[in-house]
Amino acid sequence: MYPAHLLVLSAVCVSLLGAANIPPHPLNLINFMEMIRYTIPCEKTWGEYTNYGCYCGAGGSGRPIDALDRCCYVHDNCYGDAANIRDCNPKTQSYSYKLTKRTIICYGAAGTCARVVCDCDRTAALCFGDSEYIEGHKNIDTARFCQ
């Protein structure tokens, strides 16, 4: 093997080792993003729904500021309820679902962690699709508006 080949091979191995330390997105988050993309208007991206209002994004406090923020509030509470199911972590729980005819179908036995989490995400995604997106409610001053 030529020295140049060894150098390239070494670089590839180092790159792969570095990539192995990057934590993957939980499958649940990917599923939820796909549901949101399926239900929201084409001109919006799922990312526009993070840091919206008082509850869309990490955490939440105060009263929801509009219908869309209320979707996130209900979703947060739904995840809280799901977390009470034995061995259930809603943020990492995988589940099965189907996107069809402008709706979302969740599979699995009723009451199981997977089904409850899927239903939480389904309800929120459909709610996003039915709620008005107000540009001025993105990246609001939560210390001021969410008490």
Curated annotation (Swiss-Prot):
Where would you find this protein in the cell?
Secreted
Per the UniProt entry, the disulfide pairs are C54-C146, C56-C72, C71-C127, C78-C120, C88-C113, C106-C118
Quote the cofactor binding remark.
Binds 1 Ca(2+) ion.
Q: Summarize tissue expression.
A: Expressed by the venom gland.
Q: Which SMART domains match?
A: PA2c (SM00085)
| Active site (UniProt) | H75, D121
What GO MF terms are annotated? Answer: calcium ion binding; calcium-dependent phospholipase A2 activity; phospholipid binding; toxin activity
- Specify which residues bind Ca(2+) according to the UniProt entry for this protein: Y55, G57, G59, D76
> Which GO annotations describe the biological process of this protein?
arachidonate secretion; lipid catabolic process; phospholipid metabolic process
Catalytic reaction(s) noted:
a 1,2-diacyl-sn-glycero-3-phosphocholine + H2O = a 1-acyl-sn-glycero-3-phosphocholine + a fatty acid + H(+)
Which residues are part of the propeptide segment?
Answer: 20-27
| Keywords recorded for this protein, A-Z | Calcium, Disulfide bond, Hydrolase, Lipid degradation, Lipid metabolism, Metal-binding, Neurotoxin, Presynaptic neurotoxin, Secreted, Signal, Toxin
Give the EC number(s) under which this enzyme is classified: 3.1.1.4
Give cofactor(s), names only.
Ca(2+)
UniProt superkingdom: Eukaryota
The signal sequence is: 1-19
Q: Which GO terms describe its cellular component?
A: extracellular region
Q: Which family does it belong to?
A: Belongs to the phospholipase A2 family. Group I subfamily. D49 sub-subfamily.
Q: How does it assemble?
A: Heterodimer; disulfide-linked. The A chains have phospholipase A2 activity and the B chains show homology with the basic protease inhibitors. The A3 chain is found in beta-5 bungarotoxins.
Q: What does this protein do?
A: Snake venom phospholipase A2 (PLA2) that inhibits neuromuscular transmission by blocking acetylcholine release from the nerve termini. PLA2 catalyzes the calcium-dependent hydrolysis of the 2-acyl groups in 3-sn-phosphoglycerides.
Q: Which additional comment does the entry carry? A: The A3 chain is found in beta-5 bungarotoxin.
The protein in question is named Acidic phospholipase A2 beta-bungarotoxin A3 chain
Origin organism is Bungarus multicinctus (Many-banded krait)
